[in-house]
């Protein structure tokens, strides 16, 4: 979807992805101490619900979105509270985030919107470039494992996910999950930046 269309969605209040509540899969991940408060980047921050929830728990968060109206709404939610949370209107694929390396990157339904394999590979490479050594990327991705449908947000197969990530990232966990607010299937994908390239298969002799 072009940047203009995202902005139009926020102008019209047509935001089916915005539940107004922090994503349960993220909440469970944080509450299980799988990531501790650290410098964090959220890509596709929307109106800031998840970013603010993280900041309330001690994370130092930068939230990015291509839609300036989304960022305006997120800043209104922040409303001068004493939190380490900032929002910026920025195209993550084209511009470098201003805060430097992040130890935790999060997106919910952003990676999945890119239809071309090259775009998804580029997205993953950009995440790898912004991750600090040992940093984690948690991506929640619409899954093709759900029932057939004619319309709705993009969905990706496990193969599409791994093909995009593996050149630049080591996949630590890829499992089926659900976007509970919409009762739809999802992938829970946790990865980290590669320190050595992925190796080709060896021949059995």
Kindly label every feature range from the protein language model.
Residues 1-41, 47-99, 116-130, 135-205:
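Class I (Rossmann-like) S-adenosyl-L-methionine-dependent methyltransferase catalytic domain
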Residues 102:
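Short, flexible, mixed-charge acidic loops at enzyme active sites
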Residues 106:
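A conserved beta-strand element that flanks and buttresses the S-adenosyl-L-methionine
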Residues 109-113:
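Short catalytic micro-motifs in class I SAM-dependent methyltransferases
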């Amino acid at each position: 979807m072009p940047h203009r269309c995202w902005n139009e969605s926020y102008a019209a209040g047509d935001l089916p992805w915005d539940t107004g509540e922090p994503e349960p899969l993220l909440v469970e991940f944080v509450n299980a101490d799988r990531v501790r408060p650290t410098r964090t980047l959220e890509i596709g921050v929307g109106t800031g619900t998840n970013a603010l929830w993280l900041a309330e728990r001690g994370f130092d968060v930068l939230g990015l979105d291509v839609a300036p109206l989304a960022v305006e709404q997120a800043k209104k939610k922040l409303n001068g509270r004493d939190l380490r949370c900032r929002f910026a209107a920025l195209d993550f694929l084209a511009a470098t985030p201003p805060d430097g390396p992040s130890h935790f990157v999060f997106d919910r339904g952003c990676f999945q919107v890119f239809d071309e394999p090259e775009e998804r590979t580029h997205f993953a490479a950009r995440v790898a470039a912004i991750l600090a050594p040992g940093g984690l990327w948690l991506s929640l991705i619409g899954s093709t494992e759900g029932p057939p449908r004619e319309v709705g947000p993009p969905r990706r197969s496990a193969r599409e996910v791994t093909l995009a990530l593996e050149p630049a990232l080591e996949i630590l966990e890829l499992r089926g999950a659900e976007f509970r607010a919409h009762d739809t299937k999802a992938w829970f994908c946790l990865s980290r930046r590669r320190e050595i390239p992925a190796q080709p298969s060896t021949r059995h002799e």
